């Protein structure tokens, strides 16, 4: 397997997927907290 877009040893698509999932998780937690009322202090 030869990936053309590789940063060192980590493929770019893997980095993008992990970053995207982390961003969606943080956003969902923030919006859920603000909806419940816990995130209003943020």
From Swiss-Prot:
Q: Which Pfam families match?
A: PsbJ
- Keyword Transmembrane helix set for record: yes
Biological processes annotated in GO: photosynthesis
The record gives the membrane topology as: Single-pass membrane protein
Domain of life from the UniProt record: Eukaryota
Q: How does it assemble?
A: PSII is composed of 1 copy each of membrane proteins PsbA, PsbB, PsbC, PsbD, PsbE, PsbF, PsbH, PsbI, PsbJ, PsbK, PsbL, PsbM, PsbT, PsbX, PsbY, PsbZ, Psb30/Ycf12, at least 3 peripheral proteins of the oxygen-evolving complex and a large number of cofactors. It forms dimeric complexes.
**Family, per entry:** Belongs to the PsbJ family.
Q: What does this protein do?
A: One of the components of the core complex of photosystem II (PSII). PSII is a light-driven water:plastoquinone oxidoreductase that uses light energy to abstract electrons from H(2)O, generating O(2) and a proton gradient subsequently used for ATP formation. It consists of a core antenna complex that captures photons, and an electron transfer chain that converts photonic excitation into a charge separation.
Q: Which HAMAP family match?
A: PSII_PsbJ
The name on file for this protein is Photosystem II reaction center protein J
User: Per the UniProt entry, what species is this protein from, by scientific name?
Assistant: Tupiella akineta
Taxonomy of the source species: Eukaryota, Viridiplantae, Chlorophyta, Ulvophyceae, OUU clade
């Amino acid at each position: 397997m030869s990936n053309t877009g590789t940063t060192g040893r980590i493929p770019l698509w893997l980095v993008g997927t992990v970053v995207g999932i982390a961003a969606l998780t943080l956003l969902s937690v923030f919006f859920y907290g603000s909806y419940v009322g816990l995130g209003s202090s943020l």
